[in-house]
Amino acid sequence: MTSVNKKEIEKFSKMASEWWDPEGKFKPLHKFNPIRIQYIKENITKNFKIKNKTKPLSGISVLDIGCGGGLLSEPMSRLGADVTGIDASDKNINIAKLHSKKNNLKINYLCSSPEKL
């Protein structure tokens, strides 16, 4: 059994170049992302009783499954987390790697599925 859906991979691979366009096909994710990041950050810091304000996720490992272009991975890294992002699309992983490199972020991106980890 696999969680990989080939049609979904093809669909998102075709849109890979648009991941970082806030007015493109991923506009809803860009609009929703700040709320999602805040929610994740608040829950991690609360549950792990973290007091560090500058890098509140320092020392935390994050696995972003289905990371796409890295819209969640990058903010988690900026907050101090050690991030691994996986996606079944090579194109998405390549976009994510290029974007994180431009922004001097150390994120481990892998073209993989959860079952292969």
Question: What are these language model-derived features?
Answer:
Residues 8-11, 69, 74:
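Short coil-to-beta-strand
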